[in-house]
UniProtKB/Swiss-Prot annotation:
This is Acetylglutamate kinase. It is found in: Cytoplasm. It comes from Acaryochloris marina (strain MBIC 11017). Its main location: cytoplasm. It catalyses: N-acetyl-L-glutamate + ATP = N-acetyl-L-glutamyl 5-phosphate + ADP. It is an enzyme of class 2 (transferase). The gene is argB.
């Protein structure tokens, strides 16, 4: 248990990071175990509110896979995945939109407001924030990718002292609704906002050299090394869209992308405000 001296030391270590990142935008992709465990959820909410209180400009992009699967099961629809992406036919798309926009997003808004923040929930449709296009791969249905980002709505919310909570549902130019991978949305939004950092909360310690060995964490790598890991299939499955979105956002100018373990309490604060950090950092 921390004593008073330990707490002072922690705050002292955090001070230069607070000073350095004041006024900077940090995009956080929130998903996985940190959404399912109520204790972890509470720490993430507190971390985001803390970030806002000390002068950072957090933007939270959320998934909702477990909640979507729960409602698909209730409605007798079998969840299917292909290459880490949810196969989304028309009935599944209806459930995805209902769950992400109507349930998960508004719950997060409520929790952040209760914790002392001022959250506003939006999806890609709002303010023409995101325009979607088909992902293009056969057999995955209404799975989209980001065609364009109009970040003005998010800028307005941040300038007004709010914490934007973004769900990854958007429409194309004709109004067709698409489910976009939340990691992808977080990466494209981070680039459009010229964010200081992109942070992805996952269910692993980060990028592992051997996915069976939690101690084989790769602490730091650059874009070239990340691409080599994908080609060598060290990065596979659901980690592919995570690493790919980091690469894309770095190529568009953000300073650093982090893949961290959302199962660790206060993982966000450990990454941003400590010397050692946590997880894997990817740089240009």
């Amino acid at each position: 248990m921390f004593n008073a001296s330990d707490r002072v030391q922690v705050l002292s270590e955090a001070l230069p990071y607070i000073q350095s990142f004041a006024g900077r935008t940090v995009v956080v992709k929130y998903g996985g175990a940190a959404m399912k465990d109520s204790t972890l959820k509470a720490t993430v909410i507190r971390d985001v509110v803390f970030m806002a209180c000390v002068g950072l400009r957090p933007v939270l992009v959320h998934g909702g896979g477990p909640e979507i699967n729960l409602w698909l099961e209730k409605l007798g629809i079998e969840p299917q995945f292909m290459k880490g992406l949810r196969v989304t036919d028309a009935p599944t798309m209806d459930v995805v939109e209902m769950v992400l926009v109507g349930r998960v997003n508004k719950e997060l808004v409520s929790l952040i407001n209760q914790a002392g923040g001022s959250a506003v929930g939006v999806c890609g449709k709002d303010g023409k924030l995101l325009t979607a296009r088909p992902q293009g791969e056969s057999g995955i249905g209404f799975v989209g990718e980001v065609a364009s980002v109009n970040p003005q709505l998010i800028h307005n919310l941040l300038d007004g002292g709010h914490i934007p909570i973004v769900s990854s549902v958007a429409t194309d130019e004709e109004g067709q609704v698409y489910n976009i991978n939340a990691d992808t949305v977080a990466g494209e939004l981070a680039a459009a906002l010229d964010a200081e950092k992109l942070i992805l909360l996952t269910d692993t310690p980060g990028i592992l050299q051997d996915y069976k060995d939690a101690t084989s964490l790769i602490h730091k790598l650059d874009i070239r090394q990340a691409r080599e890991l994908i080609a060598a299939e060290v990065v596979a499955g659901g980690m592919i869209p995570k690493v790919t979105c980091c690469i894309r956002s770095l190529a568009q100018g953000i300073q650093a992308a982090h893949i961290i373990d959302g199962r660790a309490p206060h993982a966000l604060l450990l990454e941003i405000f400590t010397d050692s950090g946590i997880g894997t950092m990817i740089t240009a």
